[in-house]
């Protein structure tokens, strides 16, 4: 498809023109992955996208690591069809469920921390024009996954970025310090079952790999898994390639299909290493895309 073919659909920034007369293309009867036309399909295949999260209520802000509902809508819209079932084993406050509801998909979310699960339940109960089923499980996903009775069409999730939330990164103006000063959570919980409290990197990866092997068992064949994650920097300045290490491990069971970058152009910059050492301002996440092929 050429740029000329898309000229009546996208504006100069590559975004949909906001008119009722837009030609969104034709739906292909052989498309058994999603409900998109070719013109809608091609938009998603760009390897990066900027997401700016919507404003959130106080209870949602308390969770220290959320991803945007718009991201959920894009990924769920591409990897599922209407009425399909989506799984999120690290649900947090329910962004995946909210995005699934707006897209007409059913979803199950699993969350270890009770107060976050309660927020997700409240969000799931909000009225919607889409009559979907949204289920919240306040459990450890290592226990819950083996008890699920259905197979899922897709899994979208964002696990803890190792123990990053326990470590303050930067000086007085770091995000960690800002949340601390506002009385917001700076880590998920104090539970020994919380993966974010594992201090040994290899042990953390081992536990994470086991969980996604359990996810493999409840995914339908040909179903996709998307893991939103980052490479991280330790307190002593070493980069841990968490995203790449996880991709390598899961690629032994799943087919690693691609990565898509979630870019944050509204994240404030900090002058962390000045004037003696390089420390980057990380403003992107990896959305690792895997496929189950038996």
Where are these regions (language model features)?
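Class I S-adenosyl-L-methionine-dependent methyltransferase catalytic core
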Residues: 1-294
């Amino acid at each position: 498809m050429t740029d000329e073919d898309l000229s009546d659909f996208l504006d100069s920034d590559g975004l949909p023109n906001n008119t009722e007369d837009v030609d969104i293309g034709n739906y292909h009867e052989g498309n058994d992955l999603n409900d998109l036309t070719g013109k809608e399909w091609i938009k998603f295949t760009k390897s990066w996208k900027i997401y700016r999260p919507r404003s959130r209520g106080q209870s949602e802000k308390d969770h220290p690591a959320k991803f945007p509902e718009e991201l959920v809508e894009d990924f769920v819209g591409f990897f599922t069809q209407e009425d399909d079932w989506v799984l999120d084993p690290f649900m947090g406050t329910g962004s995946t469920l909210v995005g699934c509801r707006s897209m007409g998909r059913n979803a199950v979310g699993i969350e270890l921390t009770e107060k976050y699960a309660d927020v997700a339940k409240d969000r799931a109960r909000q009225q919607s024009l889409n009559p979907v089923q949204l289920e919240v499980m306040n459990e450890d996903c290592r226990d819950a996954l083996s008890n699920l009775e259905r197979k899922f069409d897709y899994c979208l999730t964002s696990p803890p970025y190792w123990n990053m939330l326990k470590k303050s990164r930067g000086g007085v103006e770091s995000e960690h310090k800002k949340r601390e000063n506002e009385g917001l959570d700076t880590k998920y919980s104090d539970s020994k079952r919380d993966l974010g409290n594992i201090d040994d990197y290899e042990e953390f990866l081992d536990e994470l790999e086991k969980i996604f092997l359990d996810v493999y068992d409840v995914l339908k064949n040909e179903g996709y898994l998307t893991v939103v994650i980052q490479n991280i920097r330790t307190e002593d300045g070493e980069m841990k390639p968490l995203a790449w290490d996880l991709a390598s491990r899961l690629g032994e069971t799943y087919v690693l299909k691609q990565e898509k970058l979630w870019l944050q152009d509204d994240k404030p910059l900090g002058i962390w290493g000045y004037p003696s050492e390089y420390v980057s301002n990380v403003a992107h996440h990896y959305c690792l895309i895997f496929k189950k092929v038996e």
